[in-house]
């Protein structure tokens, strides 16, 4: 069975990911991790670096404020961006592997991630039907 994403119809409710708004591109680079308001730096004054005078001030801060200040360091942001890049690459590799298993016309047709998932659902349903008959 060859699947064609143009004529495929499913009874699935529409989701915000169907809008193809570019969220799949957002995870590849350095950016805010969503944990604190305002993104990197957040417009807040940074605390003193370890070893600088004023280190004792950090002991009086709430746990959440200490976390925000730790996440504001360049070292933390760089490490987070690296982890996120690795995660996104693994995610994209998994989609590429799934895409290779789906028969489509033409075989090299470029599909979005949502199209890959929907075609996989249809193909698995078709294979189940073939096994049941």
Swiss-Prot record:
Query: Which InterPro entries does this one have?
Result: bHLH_dom (IPR011598), HLH_DNA-bd_sf (IPR036638), TAL-like (IPR040238)
Ranges where the bHLH domain occurs: 75-127
List where in the cell it is found: Nucleus
Q: Which Pfam families match?
A: HLH
The alphabetized UniProt keywords are:
Developmental protein, Differentiation, DNA-binding, Nucleus, Transcription, Transcription regulation
**Keyword Nucleus in annotation:** yes
Which CDD domains does the record match to this protein?
bHLH_TS_HEN1 (cd19701)
Subunit organization: Efficient DNA binding requires dimerization with another bHLH protein.
Role: May serve as DNA-binding protein and may be involved in the control of cell-type determination, possibly within the developing nervous system.
Q: Under which name does UniProt file this protein?
A: Helix-loop-helix protein 1
């Amino acid at each position: 069975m060859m699947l064609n994403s143009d004529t495929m119809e499913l009874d699935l409710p529409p989701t915000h990911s169907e809008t193809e708004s570019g969220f799949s591109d957002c995870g590849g680079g350095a950016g805010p991790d969503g944990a604190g308001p305002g993104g990197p730096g957040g417009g807040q004054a940074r605390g003193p670096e370890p070893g600088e005078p004023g280190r004792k001030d950090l002991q009086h801060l709430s746990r959440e404020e200490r976390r925000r200040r730790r996440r504001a360091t360049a070292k933390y942001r760089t490490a987070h961006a690296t982890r996120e890049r690795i995660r996104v690459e693994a995610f994209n590799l998994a989609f590429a592997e799934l895409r290779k298993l789906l028969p489509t016309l033409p075989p090299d047709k470029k599909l979005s991630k949502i199209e890959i998932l929907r075609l996989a659902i249809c193909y698995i349903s078709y294979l189940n039907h073939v096994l049941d008959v």
